Amino acid sequence: MNIYQLFVRTFGNKNTELIQNGDKSQNGCGTFASINNNALNSLKELGITHIWLTGVIRHSSMTAFPELGIKSTNPLITKGKAGSPYSIMDYYDIDPDLAINPQNRIAEFEDIVHRIHEKGMKVIIDFIPNHLAREYKSVNRPLDVEEFGVYDNKDVNFARDNNFYYCPNQEFVVPRQLSAISHQSSAISYKEFPAKASGNDVFSPTPSVNDWYDTIKLNYGIDYLNGNTKHFDTIPNTWYKMLNIMQYWCDKGVDGFRVDMAEMVPVEFWLWSINELRDIYDVIMIAEIYQPHLYRDYIEAGFDYLYDKVGLYNTLENIYRHGQRADTI
């Protein structure tokens, strides 16, 4: 199994005259069409078996598509004008920047999946289960799918079937270093009340600029502020929502998921959801995980592959760069 990571927005961008802090019209953007047959043939000849398409699900971006009902995200909670591909705005949508015709973005994604399959390779995409964008709003979810947080009890920090964690009666405070942006225009502000916990487990209304302040932590039924107690007596609401998202992309022809920060989501969810997925789909699951003591738990939950940066990668780096003994491998 040889995986090629392909960041779509940079792969096909031939613009070499880049402007610092420039927008799409100035710096350009790759598209699915940029991944042409010549590129696919070259990857096939290289021995690639799986192409990992990075940054395809719609995420925070300061580029607006009003004709699609998509607004630009607030600069106070957007990392760079192009946005972080791990700050998801709509789990059921494709980044319109990556399409020749933004109205046709889903079909253009399905086309690249088909063309990769025609070359005898498989498709992996990112699945970001731990957090989503602060301004998340789905414009493309199926009619029978409810939006995140619609029925949450916002008067408590935790409830099993809440999708988010809350800081009751407290307003979200933009990191101080970013608030200077607001002075450039009196129209720029961001209001969130009550504040929601940030993606890197910051259960406070005042994340720092080094936190994942642009994202909101999803609630899988663990009460982190009360002894990490688990509330899995019945399936939490978030579990059903996230399983449905993976099923949606499998139906689009996706063969597997590189799961972002899988270790921040309870292993019990993976055991349940991977079993549910594999009742229907032959899906590959790859976990981003940096805690070796958890490796076995996540493999036994159904993951096919895990990152081994902390184990093998760091050991090899220490041997090559710092003179560590080779018998430490």
Q: Can you say where each PLM-predicted feature lies in the sequence?
A:
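Short, acidic/polar
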Residues: 28-43, 231-251
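Aromatic- and acidic-residue-enriched segments that line the glycan-binding/catalytic groove
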Residues: 59-88, 129-211, 298-310
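Short glycine/proline-rich turn/loop motifs
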Residues: 11-24, 88-97, 204-234, 238-239, ...
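Short, well-ordered alpha-helical packing segments
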Residues: 40, 92, 110-117, 125, ...
